[in-house]
From Swiss-Prot:
GO terms for biological process: response to wounding. This is Subtilisin-chymotrypsin inhibitor CI-1B. It comes from the Eukaryota. Gene3D superfamilies: Trypsin Inhibitor V, subunit A. It comes from Hordeum vulgare.
Length: 83
């Protein structure tokens, strides 16, 4: 069996900051590659009532739909070290 270590799952890319029926923005493709903190700042500008959760890219996410919840998926790029 092939090792999946170091691989990042591919998620479908939303189209140009998808806009929902209400006219509210529903996705933020422009934050891909940014730090979680910067992405959160940008998302909160567009959706101040968002409940943002920063989670590892390979984590299980709840399947219940919450229109105010936004997941920011992150991958650790280097080994964390003390000092």
């Amino acid at each position: 069996m092939r090792s999946m270590e170091g691989s990042v799952p591919k998620y479908p890319e939303p189209t140009e900051g998808s806009i929902g029926a209400s006219g509210a923005k529903r996705s933020w493709p422009e934050v891909v590659g940014m730090s979680a903190e910067k992405a959160k700042e940008i998302i909160l500008r567009d959706k101040p009532d968002a409940q943002i959760e920063v989670i590892p890219v390979d984590a299980m996410v709840p399947l219940d739909f919450n229109p105010n919840r936004i997941f920011i998926l992150v991958a650790v790029a280097r080994t964390p070290t003390v000092g």
